[in-house]
Amino acid sequence: NQWQPSTDGVGSAENKISQTTIADLERVSNFLKEKYNYDPGAYQNFGNSAADNYKIMARIDWNISKNHKLMVRYNDVKSQDDNLVSGASTPGGVRLNNAGRNSINSISFANTGYKQENRVRSITAELNSVFSPKVSNKLLASFTNINDTRKTDGDLFPFVDIMRLGSDGKTYEGYMSFGTEIFSFNNGVLNNTFNITDNVTIGL
């Protein structure tokens, strides 16, 4: 998070200083810890860490015999990326009247963020067989597992936006946010795909 809270309530877009004060953030943090035993996380000097990813690839080629050849290939790709809370949207589709939950108007606590985790594992096997000069066969089988999920830091807690009256005296704008990111709990895509193809070639 590039935005930092202010000491005097004066924001600066150039210096990434929010109007949200350290005193207010500290007051809310202490209240949540004492009243609900909930730690909302840091409110400054936190942010997106570097994306973490790895790839594992392995392949085996086996000449079973002169007429039968087997290939097995395995791929495993995993990536993880830290993200700040969604900038302005709410479950009801209402948009906050500011530049986001981390902006010149507002600061969100660290535990409002989420981790996007994606893992794809697949295994493929191919068996090529020659039964006679005129008959051959290719058997293909594959299995793919896709796990695309979100994880949140901290304990589960209702997401809260603290609003305040804007400078125009008519509309409310975000000032502070804490709790579990509203679109991340139990949000995930799990897919398992299995394919088998058998091709027989007969020469005339």
Provide a role label for each language-model segment:
Residues 42-45:
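Surface-exposed cleft-lining segments at the edges of enzyme active sites
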Residues 1-6, 14:
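Glycine-rich (often Gly-Gly/Gly-Pro-rich) flexible segments and glycine-rich loop motifs
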